[in-house]
């Protein structure tokens, strides 16, 4: 009986399956101009350095769906400001590609989130003006750490999985609540749980 259940811990492979089966959301990414190839280039650390036949799977966002953003932060300051005109141009270019989610991964955002936040606001505003509902995922919120590739890859993975995970967990929570059970805590790969 539901009355005897105090906690529910739920483990799932939803995200792993989405990534392996390539069934995630349609993602458009925004990256600092000059760094739009970051996900394709990866870290350049290979176990078989001279194996020219080595193949990596394509990233969840294709090169044609990465929009260059003309801005540049440097440690300790702004080298090239992100203008309102550039925000409007990027927002339009992103939404013209009809994404489910948008991943914003600008250089040095772990240290200064201003440009990512400014761009996220512009995209949300333009989406609302077009009557669209689009999730915007910023790298400074997902993984506020140095190392551009890791931060970008993690942010894109979050954007790729978010809609399906939200739908799955929302449905699970609703069904449990309808039967009188408490909301589940979701187990993480790091060993903890999340509400």
Question: Where are each of the predicted segments found?
Answer:
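N-terminally biased helix-coil "hinge/interface" segments that flank
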Residues: 1-195
């Amino acid at each position: 009986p539901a009355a005897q259940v105090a906690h529910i811990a739920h483990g799932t492979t939803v995200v792993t399956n989405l990534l392996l089966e390539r069934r995630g959301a349609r993602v458009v990414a925004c990256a600092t101009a000059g760094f739009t190839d970051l996900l394709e280039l990866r870290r350049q650390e290979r176990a078989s350095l001279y194996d020219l036949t080595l193949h990596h799977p394509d990233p969840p966002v294709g090169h044609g769906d990465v929009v260059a953003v003309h801005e540049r932060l440097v440690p300790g300051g702004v080298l090239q400001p992100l203008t309102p005109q550039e925000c409007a141009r990027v927002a339009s270019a992103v939404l013209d590609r009809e994404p489910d989610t948008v991943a914003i991964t600008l250089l040095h955002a772990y240290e200064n989130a201003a440009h990512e936040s400014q761009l996220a606001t512009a995209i949300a505003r333009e989406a609302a003006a077009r009557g669209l509902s689009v999730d915007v995922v910023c790298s400074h919120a997902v993984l506020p750490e140095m190392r551009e590739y890791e931060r970008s890859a993690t942010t894109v993975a979050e954007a790729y999985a978010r809609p399906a995970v939200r739908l799955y967990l929302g449905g699970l929570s609703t069904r449990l609540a309808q039967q009188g059970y408490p909301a589940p805590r979701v187990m993480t790969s790091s060993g903890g749980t999340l509400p």
